[in-house]
Amino acid sequence: MRKIILASGSPRRKELLELAGVPFEIIVSEVEETIGAYSSPSDIVMSLALQKASAVAENNSDHIVLGADTIVTYESRILGKPSNKAEAKEMLQLLSGKTHEVYTGVAIIAKDKTVTFYERTEVTFWELTEEEIDAYVASKEPLDKAGSYGIQGKGSIFVQHIQGDYYSVVGLPISRLVRELKQFNIDVTHA
């Protein structure tokens, strides 16, 4: 039987697959995440997801491999994972009181088929005080997250409004993924 392999070390993606009852194994993709010249954020996340999944699929061609990537954008600026606390603070100041977009791209690769898709979610932050930002950055939570916040953690208190898929902001649009897996004869809704 074909296994599902998650090409990611993200604890959030792992948790979402577990919550949905998707059986899987993890093989972390060692692909260097580089953003080339793309026309849109959706192209970027789908391309990076495909690169990650492809790298793992090379040695696991008998299985189904999932890759995913998430970016945050504000006014055409891409906000990836901050490289340090100062950059995290700068990103949070930029997002304070404003609406930004979160894009998560997913690639599903099997021997006979490849599917890519993305979800776009709008997130609006409350106005943040410097003290709130400093305390959050000091917690180190934002340092491994696109846009410098985790909506499922302490960063949730910054969110005034969300339009779209919450789980996509966490890192994996699990409802859409489960539906797309049906194309690969994987149905976890009856498990």
UniProtKB/Swiss-Prot annotation:
Key words of the record? Cytoplasm, Hydrolase, Nucleotide metabolism
Q: Which reaction does it catalyse?
A: dTTP + H2O = dTMP + diphosphate + H(+); UTP + H2O = UMP + diphosphate + H(+)
Please state where this protein is localized.
Cytoplasm
Query: What Gene Ontology terms for biological process does this UniProt record contain?
Result: nucleotide metabolic process
User: Which Pfam family is one of this chain's hits?
Assistant: Maf
Q: Name one GO cellular component term.
A: cytoplasm
Which residue numbers mark the site Important for substrate specificity?
A: R12, T70, Q152
Does the entry feature the keyword Cytoplasm, yes or no? yes
Q: Does the keyword Mitochondrion apply?
A: no
Q: Where is the active site?
A: D69 (proton acceptor)
The protein's GO terms of the molecular function aspect are: dTTP diphosphatase activity; UTP diphosphatase activity
Q: Which InterPro entries match?
A: ITPase-like_fam (IPR029001), Maf-like (IPR003697)
> What is the E.C. number?
3.6.1.9
What job does the chain carry out? Answer: Nucleoside triphosphate pyrophosphatase that hydrolyzes dTTP and UTP. May have a dual role in cell division arrest and in preventing the incorporation of modified nucleotides into cellular nucleic acids.
> What name has this protein been given in UniProt?
dTTP/UTP pyrophosphatase
- What organism does the record attribute this protein to? Bacillus anthracis
